[in-house]
Amino acid sequence: MLRQFIVSTVGRRLQLPMMAQSRLASNLDKTEYTTPGEIVDYDDPPHLPVPEYPVRPDEPLEIRKQRLLYQSRKRGMLENDLLLSTFVAKHLKDFNAEQTAEYDQLINGVSNDWDIFYWATDTKPTPPQFDTEIMRLLKEHVKNHEKVQRIRQPDL
């Protein structure tokens, strides 16, 4: 169906239905213009509750590391998938119980993955509760002083 639509519109000017044109025109009035590099970051709506992440104090260290490895690779946001999976591949094996707990709090205690990205890239200041040894390690990792290509997640 889509292929037929594309083939039938090649070389022709696509005419939008009148309703779509009026909706497009009404949205143009509400467009916000930003400068290049400006971050558009809206607050979460108050009617959207953020669930509390369950603390797992009795979880064995190796199980916690396996869970954090999985959660670092499956963020739902490519930028963080690449940053966190390469960070974990490099550092997680050397973390002790306290460091893994800090990392767990960092990636699971934040309700918005964009916050982690902005803090790690120093685009926004890191709040004091997340400004830990692990965050400093992550920021150094993001700077990529070794100039390592990070276009895919490391192999398991």
From Swiss-Prot:
Gene3D superfamilies: Flavinator of succinate dehydrogenase. SUPFAM superfamilies: YgfY-like. Belongs to the SDHAF2 family. InterPro entries: SDH, SDH_sf, SDHAF2. Residues 1-24 form a transit peptide. It is found in: Mitochondrion matrix. Plays an essential role in the assembly of succinate dehydrogenase (SDH), an enzyme complex (also referred to as respiratory complex II) that is a component of both the tricarboxylic acid (TCA) cycle and the mitochondrial electron transport chain, and which couples the oxidation of succinate to fumarate with the reduction of ubiquinone (coenzyme Q) to ubiquinol. Required for flavinylation (covalent attachment of FAD) of the flavoprotein subunit of the SDH catalytic dimer. HAMAP family: SDHAF2. Its main location: mitochondrion. It comes from the Eukaryota. Interacts with the flavoprotein subunit within the SDH catalytic dimer. This is Succinate dehydrogenase assembly factor 2-B, mitochondrial. GO terms for biological process: mitochondrial electron transport, succinate to ubiquinone; mitochondrial respiratory chain complex II assembly; protein-FAD linkage; tricarboxylic acid cycle. The lineage of its organism: Eukaryota, Metazoa, Ecdysozoa, Arthropoda, Hexapoda. One of its GO terms (cellular component) is mitochondrion. Keywords: Chaperone, Mitochondrion, Transit peptide.
